[in-house]
């Protein structure tokens, strides 16, 4: 059945409609069309219609990364430039619009539109009526809401508000109730009282998206009661001005503005140029006195000015003799001047710049105070206006001060040896009581002895050590092994050296316990009259944890630790792994998997002998990963995490849900030594999880693979987890000594000695106890580089084959005003130990934060060819990598949409349609090929190999639903016509979703009859991994080696390759002399690659990858490519890998093209079953001596095996030169998960890409039609 007109048909219709002159015109038009058909194309098949026109319509809202980033990744923390708003002791004058300026005769060529706002008489600006702000309320103005439907958006508030928002996301203050003025919407928030200083907020929607990132505003003065968000959601204490304008406000206490003016210069459109001193008058009246609006140049940064009183003469005309200079036009659109004050203020409250903002006791001879700014500060002035007293009120002599202008801090020197009591520091009117800094505790209490609970003597004795230097008393509360809620007894610990507390539990403690194994405990800490129950940070196992009980009482707020001896549990033959095909980090192929996801598919329930979702069940499916060929399995966090009920881990989550699920990725850590009970067959048994995890690692090692643990040291689930142990120490700190937070937990301060020690001790324990083979650091850029490097060295001392990688986003916050080198992407040029993920290759190949879902290289978006090439050779453009092993090459991970889903979103094609489903898989295979043939270390997300999706296939969500019903963390996907997909919701961050969303779909991964495309993609990746491991060509070990051995073929500007394009080709010479070439055509039409003379030797190559399969052996009848006179032509959405062996012959046997419908049956294979050792098959290679020799014949006759398979699956392997032709004959999954029969088009009906020789008849026909048409026209003319 015909669906769309062909290119030829379109031309005929155009001819008919254009000529409109009777039958003769029609005939002439037809002859023109036939003439066009006879004209050959040159470098690409232009006659093939493009099926996916560019469409820039954005139909989705991107989630905030947790990366981004992030991205990556986490929430944005935005610092206010000038918090708050206007309401000082100034007269409250309603703003009215300035009167039109009296226009003098314009000067020739002068742009009057860029003149400052002024007038000849005082006027007021006018705004739409705005309700007065009630006492104890704070008004937040929003220029523009992030989304159109204001009723589905709200203001989520916390900190010094009367009632912090609860019940995410619906507990926010709804914009449904917002008022509107000339600026935009506004909401009033009630504060918790006069002491309120900080208001924090964000705008979210009912789907649970944080649309703006976290924002906060500090009240500069008590009467400050409003703030504004601009269009980018930056917070200001004044109403932001339109872009390209700065408003200069001038307030005079005497109210006399007569002849007061401004003379200005710098980055302004029209600097003052009249006769001196005729400046621009202050005539417009606003909230803060008089003002002048000055148009700015593009990208303006600074401008200078003078305040003038034109009633005076000579130099006295200057109100201040010195020039004013403002250098922050990038961040401020209003400035505030007062009388003859020398300061330029960026807030309407005239708060002096140099203000103390906090004080910390940092050492026995030093106190450090933070300041709003120290620009221009003089040592003698700081000394003169500073004062320090001890807790008795006695003045302490300041012997010296050191000013750190960049860090905005002053260090006072003196005798501050009293470490038990705070000091009071004042500067002018600002006064702060010191907080004990972590630096003072490091100097006084840092400890390197043993910590935690050591079970000894067959369980008869426990040695306890806790570090808590500020505690007044510490006891251990022991709970019954069979009932963790039952207290057996309490034993006091004794104060030890350097802030430690110690005790030995045995038969003398009168607890009545002869064997402490399996009993539980918590620490009870008393400090300054307050008592807390805390979890031992060095606990080796825990009681079954249920976060739902955390609000019952303090005993349930954190988990209870267990007394265990891990050395005696699990397989005693566990040792470090001997990983196949792995010597250096460039050899690794990392596969990321979630323990529960991997076996939660009900389809394999009957095959499992162990409970699904557990370490034990994971073992039963390990052979799949061995068969795939990966070297390392990276497990999402397996250490104890907070928000989960482990007691219900056995319950299946079969219904579709993306919130309120008993499921977690594990990025909310509770402990860094104990495993979670979620993946244990018995969470109530604290020993079993240890034994079972050891067994999993052992089985991974037996199969020649390694295990990498995903660890989350950058933040905790709750700040109190460590603040209760020792306040103001374990976390990075603000300048005033309060802990910094992230995602609701604390940012662990790894520059602090005991925190760094916790991280390194944890890493060493996990390596030594579980024999793991690597670590992936979540948000590694949050850490200092020194700590990560030290952890790496400690781990490698135990396991020399261990590898480390992490998210190197530039997110380091650290301690305020204490910068240090971060463990981020910028660190890569200084280290060859730890690798980072490359967001550059991810974003360029398939899109990512902040433009996820936009077309990229494999989804139809042209990209800079040189940028793509640099990424493929492990030289990303956004950071410097001095070694290929520094770079983790990836296009999918657990965050955001899966690769399959992001492709569907980007190309706007509904996968429920067979041809779309096939096209998505073709693009997916392109991406996988590019990652697995790239230099560096490839990384695969579980299911990426078969096209995993997280589509929300609940029948109630088959079509779009009301906004308040939209699934949490979902994108609604539409096609390019704006029509929603069938089941249009796709979950992008599924950390709170059910098994129905998250499961690894084993049927898709392995059943080739039911899901031929999925299994083809899976087998394609398996072949790519085998190909990668068969040669050093894709695993070069140095940057110099890459420069010498890898060369770009598709040079932009040559042979039809554009600067930005969707094709790439390059050559690699392996260390053994073999030559490999990779060509990728991500275009929607066939493309030809000109080899020229420099790469003519590639005509002798064997094909290792085509559009259907890949591997280390040559393909007998490769599909999707053909040799041409100029070089190589690839079909649309096709890639290939070629090899020219050193001796000019094939390495191994040539593989026959196999039918797509052959089901994949992964088995536990030994080396003998590796494809490289298959029996030789007849080699069929193109004759490269003939210019028109084809690798894939244009007629594309199927092999016998293919022909045999077409009884079940018609029209297999049709060669295509356009996207539609490439995918029209595939069998794919429809919305009911049933197999859709292939489109019954015959291969013979596909258009020919070559030029036939029957053109003589065609030209004869053209001539006849033209003569007939001319006859009709002459007859018509004669009749008229």
UniProtKB/Swiss-Prot annotation:
Taxonomy, superkingdom: Bacteria
Biotechnology: This protein may have potential in the disruption of glycogen adherence of the pneumococci to the host cell or disruption of glycogen breakdown in the host cells by the bacteria and thus could be useful in treating streptococcal lung infections.
Site keyed Transition state stabilizer: positions: 895
Biased amino acid composition, Polar residues: 79-90
A Gene Ontology cellular-component term: extracellular region
Propiece span(s): 1250-1280
Keyword line: Calcium, Cell wall, Glycosidase, Hydrolase, Metal-binding, Peptidoglycan-anchor, Secreted, Signal, Virulence
Record-linked SMART domains: Aamy
UniProt keyword Transmembrane present: no
Phenotype of null mutants: Grows readily on glucose and maltotriose, but not on glycogen. No soluble alpha-glucooligosaccharides detected in the culture supernatant.
Region listing for Disordered, in residue ranges: 42-132, 1140-1248
Binding site for Ca(2+) 1: 661, 663, 992
GO biological process, any: alpha-glucan biosynthetic process
Entry keyword Metal-binding: yes
Family note: Belongs to the glycosyl hydrolase 13 family.
Domain notes from UniProt: The N-terminal tandem family 41 carbohydrate-binding modules (CBM) are involved in carbohydrate binding. The C-terminal glycosyl hydrolase 13 (GH13) domain is involved in catalysis.
Protein's name in the database: Pullulanase A
Organism: Streptococcus pneumoniae serotype 4 (strain ATCC BAA-334 / TIGR4)
Name of the gene: spuA
């Amino acid at each position: 059945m015909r669906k769309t007109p062909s290119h030829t048909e379109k031309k005929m219709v155009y001819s008919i409609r254009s000529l409109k002159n009777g039958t003769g015109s029609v005939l002439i038009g037809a002859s023109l069309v036939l003439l066009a058909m006879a004209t050959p194309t040159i470098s690409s098949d232009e006659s093939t219609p493009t099926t996916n026109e560019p469409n820039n319509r954005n139909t989705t809202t991107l989630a905030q990364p947790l990366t981004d980033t992030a991205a990556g990744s986490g929430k944005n923390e935005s610092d206010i430039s000038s918090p708050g708003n206007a309401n000082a002791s100034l007269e409250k004058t309603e703003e009215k619009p300035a009167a039109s300026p009296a226009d003098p005769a314009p000067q020739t060529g002068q742009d009057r539109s860029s003149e400052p706002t002024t007038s000849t008489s005082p006027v007021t600006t006018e705004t739409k009526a705005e309700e007065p702000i009630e006492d104890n309320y704070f008004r937040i103005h929003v220029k523009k809401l992030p989304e159109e439907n204001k009723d589905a958006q709200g203001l989520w508030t916390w900190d010094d508000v009367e009632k912090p928002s609860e019940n995410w996301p619906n507990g926010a203050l709804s914009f449904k109730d917002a008022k509107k003025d000339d600026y935009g919407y506004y909401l009033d928030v009630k504060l918790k009282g006069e002491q309120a200083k900080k208001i924090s907020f964000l705008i979210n929607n009912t789907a649970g998206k944080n649309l703006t990132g976290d924002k906060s505003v500090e009240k500069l003065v008590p009467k400050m009661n409003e703030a504004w968000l601009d269009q980018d959601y930056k917070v200001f204490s004044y109403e932001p001005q339109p872009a390209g304008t700065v408003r200069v406000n001038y307030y005079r206490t005497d109210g006399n503005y007569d002849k007061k003016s401004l003379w200005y210069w710098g980055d302004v459109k029209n600097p003052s140029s009249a006769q001196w001193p005729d400046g621009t008058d202050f005539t417009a009246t606003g909230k803060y006195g008089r003002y002048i609006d000055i148009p700015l140049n593009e990208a303006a940064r600074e401008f200078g000015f003078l305040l003038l009183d034109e009633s005076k003469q000579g130099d006295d005309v200057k109100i201040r003799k010195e020039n004013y200079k403002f250098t922050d036009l990038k961040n401020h659109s209003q400035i505030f001047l007062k009388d003859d004050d020398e300061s330029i203020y960026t807030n309407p409250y005239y708060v002096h710049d140099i203000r103390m903002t906090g004080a910390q006791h940092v050492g026995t001879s030093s106190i450090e105070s933070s300041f709003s700014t120290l620009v221009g500060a003089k040592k003698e002035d700081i000394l003169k206006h500073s004062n320090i007293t001890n807790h008795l009120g006695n003045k302490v002599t300041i012997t010296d001060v050191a000013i750190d202008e960049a860090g905005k801090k002053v260090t006072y020197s003196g005798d501050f040896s009293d470490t038990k009591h705070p000091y009071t520091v004042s500067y002018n009117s600002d006064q702060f009581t010191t907080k004990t800094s972590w630096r003072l505790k490091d100097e006084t209490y840092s400890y390197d002895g043993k910590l935690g609970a050591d079970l000894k003597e067959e369980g008869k004795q426990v040695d306890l050590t806790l570090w808590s230097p500020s505690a007044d008393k510490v006891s251990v509360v022991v709970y019954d092994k069979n009932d963790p809620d039952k207290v057996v007894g309490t034993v006091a610990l004794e104060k030890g050296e350097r802030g430690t507390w110690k005790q030995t539990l045995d038969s003398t403690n009168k607890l009545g316990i002869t064997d402490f194994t399996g009993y539980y405990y918590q620490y009870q800490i008393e400090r300054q009259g307050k008592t807390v129950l805390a979890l031992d940070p060095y606990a080796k196992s825990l009681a079954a944890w249920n976060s739902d009980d955390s609000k019952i009482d303090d005993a349930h707020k954190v988990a209870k630790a267990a007394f265990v001896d891990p050395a005696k549990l699990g397989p005693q033959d566990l040792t470090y792994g001997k990983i196949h095909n792995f010597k250096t980090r460039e050899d690794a192929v990392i596969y990321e998997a979630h323990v529960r996801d991997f076996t939660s598919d009900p389809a394999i329930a009957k095959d499992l002998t162990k409970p699904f979702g557990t370490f034990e069940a994971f073992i039963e499916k390990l052979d799949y990963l061995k068969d795939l060929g990966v070297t390392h399995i990276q497990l999402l966090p397996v250490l104890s995490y907070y928000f989960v009920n482990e007691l219900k881990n056995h319950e299946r989550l079969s219904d579709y849900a993306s919130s309120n699920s008993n499921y977690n990725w594990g990025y909310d850590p509770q402990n860094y030594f104990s495993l979670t009970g979620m993946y244990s067959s018995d969470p109530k048994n604290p020993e079993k999880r240890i034994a079972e995890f050891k067994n999993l690692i052992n089985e991974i090692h037996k199969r020649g693979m390694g295990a990498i643990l995903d660890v989350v040291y950058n933040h905790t689930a709750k700040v109190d987890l460590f603040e209760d142990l020792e306040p103001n120490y374990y976390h990075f700190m603000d300048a005033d000594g309060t802990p910094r937070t992230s995602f609701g937990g604390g940012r662990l301060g790894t520059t602090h000695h005991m925190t760094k020690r916790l991280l390194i001790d944890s890493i060493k324990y996990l390596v030594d106890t579980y024999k793991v083979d690597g670590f992936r650091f979540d948000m590694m850029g949050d850490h200092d580089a020194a700590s990560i490097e030290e952890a790496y060295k400690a781990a490698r001392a135990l396991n020399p084959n261990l590898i480390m990688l992490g998210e190197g986003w530039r997110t380091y916050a650290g301690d305020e005003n204490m910068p240090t080198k971060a463990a981020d992407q910028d660190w890569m040029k200084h280290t060859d130990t730890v690798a980072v993920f490359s967001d550059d290759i991810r974003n360029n190949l398939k899109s990512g934060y902040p433009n996820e879902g936009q077309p990229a290289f494999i989804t139809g978006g042209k990209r800079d060819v040189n940028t793509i090439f640099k990424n493929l050779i492990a030289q990303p453009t956004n950071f410097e990598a001095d070694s290929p092993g520094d770079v983790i090459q990836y296009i999918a991970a657990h965050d955001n949409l899966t690769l399959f889903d992001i492709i569907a979103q980007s190309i706007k094609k509904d996968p429920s349609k067979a041809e779309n489903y096939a096209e998505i898989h073709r693009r997916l295979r392109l991406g996988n090929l590019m990652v697995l043939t790239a230099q560096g270390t490839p990384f695969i997300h579980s299911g990426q190999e078969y096209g995993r999706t997280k589509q929300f296939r609940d029948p109630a969500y088959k079509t779009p639903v009301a906004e308040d019903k939209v699934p949490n963390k979902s994108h609604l996907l539409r096609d390019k016509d704006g029509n929603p997909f069938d089941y249009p919701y796709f979950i992008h961050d599924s950390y709170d979703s059910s098994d129905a969303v998250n499961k690894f779909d084993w049927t898709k991964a392995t059943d080739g009859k039911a899901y031929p495309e999925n299994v083809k993609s899976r087998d394609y990746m398996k072949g790519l991994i085998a190909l990668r491991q068969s040669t050093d060509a894709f695993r070069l070990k140095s940057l110099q080696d890459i420069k010498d051995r890898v060369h770009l073929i598709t040079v932009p500007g040559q042979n039809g390759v554009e600067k930005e394009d969707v094709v790439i080709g390059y050559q690699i010479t392996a260390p053994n002399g073999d030559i490999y070439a990779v060509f990728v055509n991500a275009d929607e039409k066939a493309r030809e690659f000109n080899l020229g003379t420099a790469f003519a030797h590639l005509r002798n190559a064997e094909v290792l990858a085509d559009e259907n399969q890949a591997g280390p052996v040559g393909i007998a009848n490769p599909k999707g490519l053909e040799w041409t006179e100029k070089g190589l032509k690839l079909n649309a959405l096709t890639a290939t890998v070629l090899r020219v062996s050193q001796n000019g012959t094939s390495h191994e046997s040539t593989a026959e093209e196999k039918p797509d419908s052959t089901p994949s049956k992964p088995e536990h294979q030994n080396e003998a079953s590796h494809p490289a050792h298959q029996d030789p098959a007849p080699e069929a290679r193109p004759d490269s001596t003939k210019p028109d020799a084809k690798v894939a014949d244009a007629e594309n006759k199927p092999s016998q095996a293919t022909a045999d398979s077409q009884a079940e699956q018609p029209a297999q392997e049709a060669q295509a030169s356009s996207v539609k032709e490439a995918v029209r004959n595939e069998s794919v999954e429809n919305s009911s998960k049933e197999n859709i029969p292939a489109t019954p088009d015959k291969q013979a009906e596909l258009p020919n890409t070559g030029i036939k020789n029957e053109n003589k008849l065609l030209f004869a026909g053209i001539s006849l039609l033209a003569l007939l048409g001319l006859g009709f026209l002459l007859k018509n003319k004669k009749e008229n």
